[in-house]
Amino acid sequence: MKYDVTRLVLVGLVSGLRSQLGVAAVALTTEAGESARPASLFAGVWGKRGAAAGAVGELVADKLPWTPSRLTPAGVASRMAFGGFAAVALASREPDGAPPALAAAVGAAASAVGTLAGAYWRRTAAEAGRPDWPAALLEDAAALLLAGTAVGHTDAARRAVAGAGRTASGALAGALSPSPGRG
């Protein structure tokens, strides 16, 4: 049997960028009558609210100066766990979805890649002397777009990213424009 692992890779990448967002994307798009486990955990209002609260909390906490690096062993492991879980939940919603072990492996591996890519992006911006917050907002926008694509809601993702993009692009333009005396 063939499995389309593209969406599993995307939801894993999202979890590497923002650990809670992959699970939240799956939760918020799970139908109320879903009975397949583990997606059924998100079929009720409390599952959706809990996942959304975790994602919003992380989007805010990521910008705080005392937030630890995602590259700590605990940070990488938790992102891989969230990526694996999000991929398993996503696959469980589909009649011909990948088996749980395959979905977990794909989601966790993609999450590791997303973790490293996000850290590289933020470090590159910092090394260029740019403030962190515009890079963080652009990373948020990329994660939201990938999340929407992973769960099959590309129009909603585009609208969310457009709003975030307008804010981030204005901030980024100001942060990237040369200041006096800075070549």
Where in this protein do the model-derived segments appear?
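Short amphipathic, positively biased membrane-proximal segments
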Residues: 1-183
